[in-house]
Regions:
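Short beta-strand->loop
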Residues: 77-99, 108-110, 145
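A bilobed periplasmic-binding-protein/Venus flytrap-type ligand-binding module shared by bacterial periplasmic
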Residues: 15, 100-113, 132
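Periplasmic-binding protein-like
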Residues: 1-7, 123-146
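Extracellular/periplasmic bilobal clamshell ligand-binding domains
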Residues: 147-183
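Soluble non-cytosolic domains of exported or imported proteins
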Residues: 8-9, 25, 44-47, 62, ...
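Solvent-exposed, polar/charged alpha-helical surfaces in well-ordered, non-transmembrane soluble domains
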Residues: 32, 47, 51, 55, ...
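Active-site rim elements
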Residues: 3, 106-109, 161-163
């Protein structure tokens, strides 16, 4: 297994999700199981994990799909070779669905121009903005169908845990990583 550091927010959110579903004991066992199978110390970003799997340095990793989208879109022969050297799996499709990270927007209470801020957020949820965001950043849109390189990965069942729950569970998630020896 190749992974990023446990201090990365992606992994903290993932652990918070596991914690919410499996409870403290189940999440601790999961983290210990992953950490005990590391092929190397946690390092790099998701692209580094994907490249490590493609090169055979490790057999499996967890990565955000937009990093795969970047490799799909790059056009570089070495990136095509990386994509050709991996298999993409969306886990937990028969039960809770795949954990997802989100990009969000909000308006702070002290915002000087709340009305325009709200209009901007409303625009961000339009079909046009979601398409631009999906194609420009290679992320699955919140609203509508995926377009661009990411669309080749297909659809998947998403974990429905609220992002607010993930925030509440972050502190405990970090503690479980520490106990598991996942640096």
């Amino acid at each position: 297994v190749c992974m990023r550091s446990s201090g990365n927010i992606y992994n903290i959110s993932l652990m918070a999700s596991v914690l919410e579903v499996a409870g403290a004991e189940g999440a601790a066992n999961w983290a210990k199981g992953v950490a005990s199978n590391f092929a190397r110390d946690p390092q790099s970003n998701d692209t580094g994990q994907i490249r490590a799997v493609a090169s055979g340095e490790c057999k499996v990793s967890i990565a955000n799909t937009y990093y795969i989208g970047r490799l799909l879109a790059s056009g570089k022969p070495e990136d095509k070779a990386v994509i050709d050297g991996i298999r993409i799996v969306f886990p937990n499709q028969s039960d809770r669905g795949t954990h997802v990270n989100i990009s969000g927007a909000g308006v702070v209470a002290s915002a000087p121009n709340k009305e325009n801020a709200i209009k901007f957020i409303e625009y961000l949820t339009s079909d046009e903005a979601q398409r631009i965001f999906a194609e420009g950043n290679n992320e699955y849109p919140v609203i509508g169908e995926a377009t661009g390189p990411i669309s080749t990965l297909g659809s998947f069942n998403e974990d429905q845990i609220s992002a607010s729950i993930l925030g509440v569970r972050q502190k405990e998630a970090v503690e479980l990583f520490d106990q598991a020896g996942w640096l």
